[in-house]
Amino acid sequence: MFRGANAISLDAKGRLAMPSRYRDELVSRCAGQLIVTIDAVDPCLTVYPLPEWELIEAKLRELPSLREETRRLQRLLIGNAVDLELDGNGRFLIPPRLREYAKLDKRAMLVGQLNKFQLWDEDAWNAMAEADLAAIKQPGGLPDELRDLIL
């Protein structure tokens, strides 16, 4: 399980180091093989361990292919998916096209989302986190079924 928000740096080539607290789990679960693609909802990238991504692909394959919404989602997620592998130093390279999409420069946030990560530009993450906190504090900011989850 991946949790927590981690400030990380991208080097001039677009490489970033996976925080050490996740490396062993990623090596044991998927031999360091990852998939990165755009996030279909948020202005960030999503990084999946390969087995998790294969589950997503299986679900996408089962959707009705004649629906425009299905094809649109498949184009966005599968069409932008890139295979990555952690190198010996725990680094991986984000392709330029995906860095541009997420507006990644030197400072980023790798955010654990249980079975995957989101990769955000640091400023965009901070703005989103503030907006999310403000939204849930508003009356009606959380649906009733989610209120029961808050401890």
UniProtKB/Swiss-Prot annotation:
A molecular-function term among this protein's GO annotations: DNA-binding transcription factor activity
NCBIfam families linked to this entry: division/cell wall cluster transcriptional repressor MraZ
UniProt protein name: Transcriptional regulator MraZ
Residues annotated as domain SpoVT-AbrB: 5-52, 81-124
PANTHER family, sorted: TRANSCRIPTIONAL REGULATOR MRAZ
Keyword tRNA-binding listed: no
Database matches in CDD domains: MraZ_C, MraZ_N
Locations listed in the record: Cytoplasm, Nucleoid
Database matches in PROSITE patterns: SPOVT_ABRB
InterPro entries the UniProt entry points to: MraZ (IPR003444), MraZ_C (IPR035644), MraZ_dom (IPR020603), MraZ_N (IPR035642), MraZ_sf (IPR038619), SpoVT-AbrB_dom (IPR007159), SpoVT-AbrB_sf (IPR037914)
Keywords: Cytoplasm, DNA-binding, Repeat, Transcription, Transcription regulation
Similarity annotation: Belongs to the MraZ family.
